[in-house]
Amino acid sequence: MPTLILCRHGQSVWNAENLFTGWTDVDLSDQGVEEATTSGDRLKQEGIEIDVAFTSVLQRAIKTTYHLLERSNQLFVPLYKSWRLNERHYGGLQGLNKDAAREEFGEEQVHIWRRSYDIAPPDATAEQREADLADRKYQGLDERVIPTSESLKDTLERVIPYWNDAIAPELLTGKTVLVSAHGNSLRALIKHIEGVSDEDIVGYEIKTGAPLIYELDDNLGFVSKHYL
């Protein structure tokens, strides 16, 4: 039976400062490192053997993956990185304090941007856009696929092709697969796997640094899930 382990990265320094992060490549906080290493210890204690791992190209997810694999003595496991597993792009909100954004735009508007399924925040500024296009992580990509802002729906539409092309084929061979990513890219996968409604998925909370283990049937249908 295929097993899928989803893990949201440990707390980042911008999570701790209550800032919109998105594609900004910030590091884990000390708490985030502790969350990831503790979960790696749990993987080892439970004897969970991972066959292949996937993560984004953002360091907070990559480092979480490393801590999970290092603490469970599984650094040899093949690891694949893709921009398609990045966090939702928060456009012009990136770098703003969430409370300050509520004061500037209004609490209701910020809530709509954060918790609507198909409404994106304002586009990235020209400076932010230039930085994304110049980032080595995205060299070789058609600039049209690099977002200026995303809704959760937009995030799902870039995540699911990677699920279909890279992740699902590994699961279909019966492997145990780790996906260490971000709150919204994982929401996209959860919506796809469980068939969660548009209305319900936006409020779905995912713990930081805590492996969420899915048991799937041979056709990758949802059977059960639990946090480690």
Curated annotation (Swiss-Prot):
Entry's EC annotation: 5.4.2.11
Recorded metabolic or biological pathway in which this protein acts: Carbohydrate degradation; glycolysis; pyruvate from D-glyceraldehyde 3-phosphate: step 3/5
GO biological process: gluconeogenesis; glycolytic process
Leading EC class: isomerase
Residues binding substrate: 8-15, 21-22, 60, 87-90, 98, 114-115, 183-184
A Pfam cross-reference name: His_Phos_1
Catalytic residues identified in the record: 9, 87
Reactions catalysed according to its record: (2R)-2-phosphoglycerate = (2R)-3-phosphoglycerate
Residue(s) at site: Transition state stabilizer: 182
Top-rank taxon: Bacteria
Signal peptide (UniProt feature, chain positions): none
Keywords, sorted A to Z: Gluconeogenesis, Glycolysis, Isomerase
Alphabetical list of SMART domains matching this protein: PGAM
Gene Ontology molecular function: any one: phosphoglycerate mutase activity
Function: Catalyzes the interconversion of 2-phosphoglycerate and 3-phosphoglycerate.
Family (UniProt): Belongs to the phosphoglycerate mutase family. BPG-dependent PGAM subfamily.
Name of protein: 2,3-bisphosphoglycerate-dependent phosphoglycerate mutase
Species: Staphylococcus carnosus (strain TM300)
Lineage of source species: Bacteria, Bacillati, Bacillota, Bacilli, Bacillales
